[in-house]
Amino acid sequence: MNKTKFLNLKELVIVLLLACVETAIALVTAMPFAANLQLVYFLAHGLAGLINGIIYVLLVKKCPKIGTQFIIPMIYGLYFLFTGSVYVFAFFAILAVVNELIMLGGGYQSKIRPAIPHALTWMLNAMGSTLTMLLFRDSLVQSYVAMGMDAASADAAIASLEGFWLAPQNIAIALAAAAALSIAGYALGMKMLGKHFKPAGVA
């Protein structure tokens, strides 16, 4: 494969920096909603996708090469790894590969296809806790026990959370909101690309 299809050192630095900015924005966006579980689930992740859509468009227009789509979710996933959420990191590592595969074969020449990895990233972000409870419930119970809870109390605590995180209607709302706002963010970024980024020579 032609070497120009891969990120060079300068582009790698740009992607790493902007991916870190996306992660920081996601964390800051969630802070005002931290006390309200419903707003975190239904709104915070979509808002992060909306705001980060502008940065994402700039990123993929400046660095439309193999490696870009892998790095974006991996950086976000590493945050979860460092904070002890190993399973969520694993989800984002898988998504990093999926997003990269989606963009192979001329994906960056399309105006539509780049929106898919962006939407998937923030949809997965909305589903992090849901998937962890669904797939690794026993491990969660054991983590509560390790913190000093007895097994019955730990199981009851997880069960109380499952009623919210695993409710089908809540999952549907969270996914729809994250997808819609992320796509809106991408569309806003594309609009700004023509009006501001290109005239300014940024992209």
Language model features: what each stretch is:
Residues L18-T29, A48, N52, Y56, ...:
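Alpha-helical transmembrane segments of multipass membrane proteins
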Residues N2-I71:
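Hydrophobic transmembrane alpha-helices
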Residues A30, A34, I75-M103:
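Interfacial aromatic-anchored transmembrane helix boundaries in multi-pass membrane proteins
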